[in-house]
Amino acid sequence: NMQIDYDEQVAYHAEQWLFDWARDTDARPFLLWASFTHPHNPFITTKEYWQLYDHDRIDLPRVPFIPIAERDAWSQRYAYTIRADEHDISEENIRTARHAYYAMTSYFDALVGRLLGVLDRIGAAQQTCVVIVADHGEMMGERGSWFKFQPFEWSVRVPMIVAGPGVRRGHREEKAVSLLDLLPTFNDLATDGAGVTPVDPLDGASLAGMLGGD
């Protein structure tokens, strides 16, 4: 599977980069961006992660199938783009796809765990802020739709998980934030709030205060 091969390479090179950084004498803050493809269609996984889930207990979409002719104009156009009108997707097909997606998410979790393990080994775990984000969600069969490109919650909302020194543990923020906020946030974290601005104006707003409970 090319996705697995690719992500294994990303994890390997990220691990090596961290080991190289630990051997370096440069004391400046670092930014390591490890861009994994998982979870992403095609929904293919390995037996190891598939077996973490009971297939019969995989949940089905909360919003049932909506006939293409009854969908909004954009959803109709997208359905025809992916040729959804040419295929009948059974309940078992849906359950299998969702099962694989969950398994792929667990594989991604394991890859992140590898990087966290290296941070611990090089003594940087306690002073490193770790952020998990994604560029899009996944419809997962909701409304009868799949993949991204949909103006609905499942496709538009992405995770933003943050852990590190000074970050509140176990807090779930209800305010809307954006991926645009990442750069000013990283800037504040790296400069202890000194406000060094790489460009002016800088899109987005720093979330550093929010992460700390301000």
Q: Where are the predicted features?
A:
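Zinc-coordinating Cys/His ligand positions in small cysteine/histidine-rich zinc-finger domains
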Residues: L179, L183
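Short, intrinsically disordered, charge-balanced linker/junction segments flanking boundaries
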Residues: G204-D214
